[in-house]
Amino acid sequence: MSASHHLLRLQCVRCVSHFLGTPVRQVILPGRAHLQTPGSQHIYVQLLRPFHRSAVCSTDRQNRTDIEKLVEDETHHKDKTLVTHDDIFDRAAGDSKTKVEFNRVVDVFKSKDIRRRGHVEFIYAALKKMPEFGVECDVTVYNKLLDVFPKEVFVPQNFIQRMFNHYPRQQECGVQVLEQMENYGVMPNIETKVLLVQIFGEKSHPIRKFQRIMYWFPKFKHTNPYPVPHVLPSDPVDLAQFSLTRIAADLDAKITIYQYPSTDITETGEEITRPHIVGIQSPDQRSLLAKHNPCKPVFVEGPYPLWLRQKCVHYYLLRADPIPPEEKVEEEIDPEMICPEQSLFFPQRVELDLKVDMGDDHSFNVDEVEEGAVYAMCMAGQGDQATLSQWISGLQETCPILGQIPTVFRLESGPRELQTSTDDHQRPEQEAETDQIIEDDEEPRHSRGVKQ
């Protein structure tokens, strides 16, 4: 018997109770309902058998975990917004945000409801929380998120559904998962394709996105001739050597370690930390420094950032000002290099502008900014003037003329010298005293900025 007939019979029972105007007691019999009213005859009406709820679907289980309770509370008390699962990851993980906790939250959501209600909002919230758990570069976690989608529900069944955007919100969510994989450089595997085919079908937008990724990723995988390793050295000295070698354009450049990181304890019990100092200099830079005019200063500038994947290091330069045009000396051309007897196949000198082609527009001109020569580079654990002075002292061993050249330190605030939040709440009296100290100490600081 259909459900509509059952509902009509239940409504008839309520009408009988309203017509008699007396309370009715229902006694559930195997196939009939015995309606008893005080002072009336027995009326037998066939009623629907009571529905029994399975023990598996009961929500009063005693062995529920904390995450299951959080997911259930979030489902019952969720807002009408699009994303309502952001707090589940924070409250479930607590302080330990690891891959295990992330997978645990996903598993609890999958086992909560077989229909996966709210799975799109959950996937968007999980994508946003992946960098906090450190799983943004793990392909297995992305496959686990794709497994949250119901299978064979969003697959188009005819050509009309394929022609239009079938279930656009779910397809857009699947494309967003692949977009994040592409942004973090994660290569999909065969399991990703199987999941996408089971969820959206073979002619869907996520499958087309998957095909584009698999076409372009192998082509650009080895295009960089100087790749950065995925695991960087943990030792600061090794990391500095790798970074300076990557910056230097000369293969003959030599790396020198002027000081290793160490910690000493004085007789008074004071702890002194010595940072590492690693420098690099090529033979051409050394010869240019030897020709530098001792009357003109050289400058120590920095720090300049260098990004190695997600890690940022800083380096410093020893450079000079650009040479004025009136002091430039043109190189004399050897007449033997341009004589008619030179070989046409191996010419010693060719006066051709290789930067300009025959069809180029000569009216467009780009002003090239001239910069001074760079004599050396270094990386140090601390960017203060005392530490960099030790680097200059080490350079004087190979370039004695550096002791006769004045050195000016033009240093900016490094990463360890940023203003903290406690300095923002400084009292006006303290600020006035600080300004007075700076004004009094301004002239000695200029004198200390130049090292003779």
UniProtKB/Swiss-Prot annotation:
Origin: domain of life: Eukaryota
Query: This chain belongs to which protein, by name?
Result: Evolutionarily conserved signaling intermediate in Toll pathway, mitochondrial
Please state which protein family the record places this protein in. Belongs to the ECSIT family.
Q: List the disulfide bonds.
A: none
One of its Pfam families is ECSIT_N
User: Where is the sequence biased in composition, kind Acidic residues?
Assistant: 431-442
Annotated GO biological process: cell surface receptor protein serine/threonine kinase signaling pathway; innate immune response; regulation of oxidoreductase activity; regulation of protein complex stability
Q: Keywords assigned by UniProt?
A: Cytoplasm, Immunity, Innate immunity, Mitochondrion, Nucleus, Transit peptide
An annotated GO cellular component: nucleus
Q: Where is this region: Disordered?
A: 413-452
Function, please? Adapter protein of the Toll-like and IL-1 receptor signaling pathway that is involved in the activation of NF-kappa-B. Required for efficient assembly of mitochondrial NADH:ubiquinone oxidoreductase.
Q: Which InterPro entries match?
A: ECIST_C, ECSIT, ECSIT_N
Q: Where is the transit peptide?
A: 1-58
As for subcellular location, the record says: Cytoplasm; Nucleus; Mitochondrion
